[in-house]
A protein has these predicted regions:
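Active-site core segments that coordinate phosphate-bearing ligands/cofactors
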Residues: 5-6, 72, 110-126, 130-166, ...
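Carbohydrate-associated surface elements
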Residues: 105
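Conserved phosphate-binding/catalytic loop of the ribokinase/pfkB sugar-kinase fold
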Residues: 102
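Active-site beta-strand/loop segments that form the cofactor-binding cradle
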Residues: 81, 89, 176, 209, ...
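N-terminal glycine/serine-rich phosphate-binding loop of ATP-dependent small-molecule kinases
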Residues: 1-99, 113, 145, 228, ...
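Anionic group-transfer/hydrolysis microenvironments
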Residues: 10, 93, 212, 271, ...
Length: 522
């Protein structure tokens, strides 16, 4: 039996999954971590990356031995995935030059706007190229020493293999991709170099960006140093082949088998984003719509919101804390299930309650920062059912505003495949999202495995693919042929209730603007 390892560094958890050649999960391990807000920047410390990789692999290896009775000694392929975008730069000796600036930051507005106008292509603030221009334009002390700019997935892949490469889907969140060549767009690279010329830097853009590879290509092998980094016990041997590292968007597409034109998926966890694979790339400049690619290079339209479940999780933790103080500490899974299910019996419009869940800025609604808030009027129907429903609607609201833009552009999709934390409690998030987006929402049993499973599948494809076998055929015929899919269609009451909720939500955004202006973050 061939065993494939997938590792994903998510916003709140680093997860490792081992699968067989048919995609069946064999063992898993994980490590919880959180981003830090330091000196005005959302970041993670790279020492925590090392710790998280080791702990998640250690837990996976123990889980494998417990389940199968033998130690995990041979792995046939490995893949690494992580949160896309951000800014992670190193010098020639691979010393870190600046704090890791994650996707969550909204500090590059001027650079993103300038690049959008220069390229005629929407460049979001979280993209690596926007962060690079921001650092150069600001005259930051490290810019002349940059030898390598990469993402978190690219960084970890380099540490394990010594190869400075990324998958094309991951690359599309660094710099725009030309889907006819599956490489960085040459015209935009040239324009970027021209913009930076006045700063007399010792490098050109392509000098510092990772090489772009497509799904199925070999991306290097586990080095001795990489094996020790992942497994300090020495049980893991060097020489294991790697697939190209991909971002959470690409692994989400793979995990839901949504990589063919006119298919789509929605990932709902710490952030929320919907991706629809297109027949051909959008040509119109849509500043609030991101244009990325699948792991095979097909054009994708993405609607992205920085915050989804963070505020929900904070409230659930508050309820848990209250119950614990009363001497009745709850089972977290049961607490989530109870609270989420209560939302299904609330008033369709949440009884006049409204929540703004912004923990960070949001491009779609033009916020540079966020302040989570909850508002009600004296005559609101303030019940736990309506409260939870308002929190769940808020988690979907910004996505809905972006999806409306795609509807205006006549981008169509028959259904969206959902995955992520919002769907862990069966039915609830799926049903409310179907009504909110007025689109059927489907969930696969396997989608709960998430991005670590998705990148493990890409590792399996890279190693076992037959001659001329496409990723689409591999997934259709070998992984998802017998997949169980649950689909929920929009409910008219949910749809009408969400529309009423959105009217209050849009009005409450003015309160949010005042909160951002008046309440400062320490």
């Amino acid at each position: 039996m061939k065993i494939f390892l997938g590792i994903e560094l998510g916003s709140t958890r680093i997860k490792a999954v081992a699968i067989d050649q048919n995609g069946k999960p064999l063992a898993s391990g994980g490590f919880d971590w959180e981003n830090r807000y330091e000196n005005g920047v959302w970041t993670y410390h790279l020492k925590d990356v090392r710790t998280g990789l080791q702990e998640s692999y250690k837990e996976l290896a123990a889980d494998y031995k417990e389940k199968h009775g033998t130690p995990l000694t041979e792995i046939s392929g490995i893949g690494v995935s992580a949160m896309m975008h951000g800014y992670l730069v190193h010098d020639k000796l691979y010393n870190q030059l600046a704090e890791f600036r994650t996707w969550r930051n909204t500090i590059t507005e001027k650079s993103a706007d300038l690049l959008t106008k220069t390229f005629g292509f929407a460049i979001p603030q979280r993209w690596s190229i926007a962060h690079l221009h921001h650092a150069v334009a600001g005259g930051e002390s490290h810019i002349n020493d940059i030898h390598n700019l990469s993402t978190l997935a690219g960084y970890v892949h380099y540490r394990l293999t010594g190869e400075n490469v990324v998958g094309v889907g991951e690359a599309s969140g660094i710099m725009p991709i030309d889907s006819t060549t599956n490489d960085y767009d040459a015209e935009m690279v040239s324009k970027m170099d021209s913009l930076l010329e006045e700063h007399k830097l010792p490098w050109k853009v392509l000098d510092i960006l990772p090489k772009v590879l497509c799904a199925g290509e070999n991306a290097g092998y586990l080095t001795e140093e990489g094996a020790k980094l992942l497994d300090p016990t020495g049980g893991l041997k060097a020489g294991v082949p790697f697939c190209p590292p991909e971002g959470d968007a690409g692994t989400g597409m793979v995990a839901t088998n949504a990589i063919k034109p006119n298919t789509g998926n929605v990932s709902a966890g710490t952030s929320i984003f919907a991706m629809i694979v297109l027949e051909k790339a959008l040509t119109k400049l849509l500043p609030k719509i991101n244009k990325i690619t699948t792991p095979t290079g097909r054009p994708v339209a993405m609607v992205h919101s920085n915050t989804c479940t963070s505020d929900l999780d904070a409230w659930v933790n508050l309820f848990s804390e209250a119950m614990t103080k009363m001497g009745n500490p709850p089972d977290k899974t049961e607490l989530y299930r109870t609270l989420y299910n209560s939302a299904l019996t609330g008033d369709p419009d949440c009884g006049g309650l409204v929540s703004i869940n912004y923990h960070a800025g949001e491009t779609v609604t033009e916020f540079l920062e966020g302040r989570p808030l909850f508002v009600r009027t004296p005559d609101s129907n303030f019940t736990i059912e309506n409260f939870m429903r308002s929190l769940l609607f808020s988690a979907i609201a910004t996505l809905k505003l972006g999806m409306d833009i795609l509807t205006e552009e006549e981008v169509k999709v028959s259904k969206l495949l959902g995955h992520g934390g919002l769907f862990k409690t069966p039915v609830v998030g799926q049903k409310l999202m179907a009504g909110a987006l007025n689109t059927p929402i489907a969930v696969m049993e396997s989608a709960g495995e998430g991005g670590a499973w998705g990148i493990a599948l890409l590792a399996a494809y890279a190693v076992t693919k037959e001659t001329d076998e496409t990723l689409e055929n591999f997934l259709d015929n070998k992984i998802f042929a017998d997949a169980t899919v649950s689909t929920i269609k929009p409910d008219a009451k949910d749809k009408k209730g969400f529309e009423a909720y959105m009217e209050r939500y849009k009005a409450a955004l003015e309160i949010e603007r005042t909160a951002v202006d008046k309440l400062t973050i320490k």
